[in-house]
Amino acid sequence: MKSFAHEIHGMPVHAIDGEIGTIQDVLFDPESWTVRYLEVSTGWLFGRDVLIPVDKVKRIDAPDGVATFDCTKEQIENSPNAEPERAIDRDYESRLVSHYGLAPYWAAPPEAGVPPQAMPIGAPAQVPETAEELRLLSGGEIDGYDLDAQGETVGTVRDVLIDLDTWKVSSLMADLGGIFSQDVETIGVGPVVGVDRENGIVNVSTSPEKMGHGTGEKLPFVFPYVPPLA
């Protein structure tokens, strides 16, 4: 099942032992186009936003509008705090995945025929010698990025389309018709050749002339998105 990031914004999140908050955003790797974490607002419960690895998502029931996580309230309450003044780096992510008993996704895959080693819950994940920035993007951050086709600005990125079974970002939702446009188009991430976070630009290899003339599905879109009331 596929969903735009804005469609799961505000969705209630249930832990094993009860409701914990609502989904606020998705964080994805713009190189592999894979969602790594969901940002969850715990509101009155714990009073902070937390990042939870998508590997802990048990299911997302779109018809009922509920996301169920395979972890407890206590696990979420005791999860490592992200420091607002620091970028998310390998050190923080290492502590986060270790807290949830997960293997780091950046670890090298096992050799063919050799089963991966199980990682005990609470065991420290391996951290590179330098704590490089993870360079994750959020759905909220990429909203508003310019879409640049071979040096020409052709539109504005509005959202990402996510496969909720694989957590892969398959397409970008882009407004190619200006601020007053009522139509947007989905553009596959295949032609994306780079994401310039400093200047807020997504670069694609497609020529400006071909933008808007592909197989992208025309979709009704209202901006800004207002999540349904809980």
Please report, for each region that a protein language model flagged, where it lies by residue.
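Peripheral interaction segments used for macromolecular assembly
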Residues: 1-230
